[in-house]
Amino acid sequence: MRSEPGPRLARLRDILQMRFTDIFAAMSPAALSGISPASPLRRLARVGAYVVLRLVGHLFQPVRNQADLHGAVWLYVVSANNYEALQFIQGAQPGAVLVAGQGKNIGRYNGAVRQLSLRRKVLHYWQYPGALAGLWRREGPRAWRFFDLVFYAIGYYEVYGRALRHYRPRAVVFANDHNDDARALLLACRTEGIPTAYVQHASVSANFPPLGFDLSLLEGQDALDKYRRCGPVRGQVALVGMPKADVYLARRNQAPAVCRVGLACNIHDPLPALAETLAYLAQALPALTLTLRPHPSDTRDFGPLRRQLPQVQWSDARRQNVFEFLETQDALVAADTSTHLEATLLNVASIYYRFAANPLTDDYYGYVAHGLVPRAADLPALGALLGALAHHKPADLYYRAAYYNATLGTPDEGRSQPLAARVLGEWLGAAGVPA
């Protein structure tokens, strides 16, 4: 047993890879507060709540799955976006089951997802003191700064390993490669010899963990280039476009001029800057209809902003998916979000405008550098770009997305779902896993 802490610590560090990057540590206090509060006492309080509501709470919440998980292809999801990215595989792989960890919030899809029991997770917290000490020696003060995130990650690997041994799924398909529970399941699959596949569900950055699946279905060359910068690429890779966009590509925006402008924001975008931007555009371009769409995970109080700017419309991301939102817009203004790519695919004119000034996240996805979207450096520049688009919007903006979406301009354009399903089925067959 004395030889185990080394491998165990390395595994935990792998699971927490994103939490110890410079870019994560440099997130704004407002963004970090919802993940890991700055105050040690608040972090400790959240750990206490986790113990009561999750670790102890799960003991009194038995998991009763309607679908049989034995020998099935698991589609592992951590969010509603993940669900939408993987749901199409169910039609192509009879018996495929959407699964998530016990208590995971999948939004409006909670009732459609089977749960993996986490009741035994509490048994593995004897590891925590040694793990935190080991991470302190390796990572320094960041281990203490994020002691709550380290706490949450304990036990996933062991519990998921037990579930894999019990159910023996034919394969596990992921749409997330960096959340702690997803990474723990990936590592457990490697240990138990379960084949793994990955379907990219959003744009990626060079700060992600190395691509570590047996099969990776990426959207385009951009994603592959970035993953190569992250480290060695494991397994097979296929470029299949964006499956979740298929149904919408035939309904691209044909408006000759911009009348409706959507602003997408997330927790990284300060509310004062959002208010300033909306107020400026409402005054400078009064003919435009403005709609604000907060990210579904953004739980800040937008009430004062609603009262300050009653003319602004709102999109509820919990009820309206991103493509449904974009279908109601002619232009998009946003900072660092993959919505820029989704907008461009629908020929919605998209503009990169930063509401915050963190230098580590400037052009985080490289959209400006690769010519996908123009940058507005300040409010007058943003107003000028939108003013020009209000007179004329090009009809061929979507061609800019070819580097990000491998099927654009090919016979498979708008058919990424059957392409991905075919590649996945062939891989399962070649791996000796019945499709």
Stretch-by-stretch model annotation:
Residues 159, 204-205, 320-324, 381:
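Short acidic active-site motifs
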Residues 213, 234-235, 239, 338-409:
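Catalytic binding pocket for nucleotide-activated donors in carbohydrate/polymer assembly enzymes
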Residues 91-93, 238-308:
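Conserved catalytic-core segment of nucleotide-activated headgroup transferases in glycan assembly
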